[in-house]
């Protein structure tokens, strides 16, 4: 394994690095990038029991009973069908460990709810730091989309955690979401997709206010795909994570993060020029609202928009 560069943060890796976004925004590929070093291990699925409203947030707010939480843990979060495939903790957590962790949680919860939730999370996920052939790691990278939106809960349970928000052009993210749902459930249309995306961005912005200063980073997926900006982005991510941007991270970025693989500009597919212009007008209105309201990722989104517009103008001239 190549040695890490000497540019790592002085305080070193975080025990927990949460990577989130709106959904369809590049969270998974950035989480994989962050874990491409000897200090972190990637939790290979979105676990979601700590971010869904039926999970830790609702449980600790008193809106969800322990019984209902345990039922969902043993059902959907263990082995759930979503978007044409089975997902859930069963993909990497041995059943014996799962059952033991739930039993321990059940016994602790009534005495100290927050401690029980924290320990359940660690009992289930922390063992990935010692599994595999790469030796023991210092921390985990967890990639459930809502980790930043649910930071009021997670930052309280895990004060040692750091949070990354990956922002993507809302036209691409929302088009991907509409396509993923196959127009069967909301959001079904491009307009609904932008509405869905804007609400998610605002929830992330609100949630991020609960994160301690110095423990939150926002990055643009588009910047990882652009020559020049990609070097700055990987250095920023590595520094924030407390590691060096070593050869494994750089190789992964070169191989897996490019405009083609990221489907940059996918929102144009299947739309006639007039329909594309309509989507663009609606998106500009969304961007202007976000900028007016001081949403912190708005400059990242504006930069991606202007870059895509410039590239479109160049294609038209050519």
Task: Please state what every model-predicted region is.
Residues 1-17, 178-181, 205-209, 218, ...:
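PAPS-dependent sulfotransferases, especially Golgi type II membrane carbohydrate sulfotransferases
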Residues 28-40:
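A conserved segment at the C-terminal end of the G1
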């Amino acid at each position: 394994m190549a040695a890490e560069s000497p540019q790592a943060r002085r305080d070193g890796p975080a025990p927990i690095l949460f990577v989130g976004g709106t959904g369809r925004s590049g969270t998974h590929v950035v989480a994989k990038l962050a874990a491409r070093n000897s200090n972190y291990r990637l939790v290979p699925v979105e676990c979601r029991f700590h971010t869904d409203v039926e999970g830790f947030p609702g449980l600790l707010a008193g809106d969800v009973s322990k019984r209902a939480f345990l039922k969902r843990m043993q059902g959907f979060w263990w082995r759930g069908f979503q978007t044409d495939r089975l997902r859930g903790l069963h993909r990497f957590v041995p059943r014996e460990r799962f059952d033991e962790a739930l039993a321990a949680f059940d016994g602790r919860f009534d005495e100290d709810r927050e401690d029980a939730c924290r320990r359940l999370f660690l009992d289930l996920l922390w063992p990935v730091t010692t599994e595999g052939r790469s030796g023991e790691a210092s921390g985990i990278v967890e990639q459930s989309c809502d980790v930043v939106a649910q930071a009021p809960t997670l930052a309280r349970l895990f004060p040692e955690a750091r949070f990354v928000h990956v922002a993507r052009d809302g036209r691409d993210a929302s088009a991907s979401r509409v396509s993923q749902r196959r127009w069967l459930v909301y959001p079904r249309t491009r307009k609904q997709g932008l509405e869905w995306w804007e609400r998610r961005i605002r929830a992330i912005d609100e949630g991020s206010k609960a994160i301690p200063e110095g423990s939150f980073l926002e990055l643009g997926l588009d910047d990882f795909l652009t020559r020049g900006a990609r070097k700055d982005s990987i250095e920023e991510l590595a520094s924030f994570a407390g590691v060096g941007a070593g050869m494994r991270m750089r190789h992964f970025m070169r191989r897996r993060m490019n405009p083609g693989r990221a489907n940059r500009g996918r929102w144009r597919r299947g739309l006639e020029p007039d329909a594309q212009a309509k989507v663009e007008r609606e998106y500009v209105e969304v961007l202007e609202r976000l900028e007016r309201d001081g949403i912190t990722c708005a400059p990242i989104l504006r930069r991606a928009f202007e870059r895509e517009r410039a590239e479109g103008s160049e294609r038209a001239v050519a």
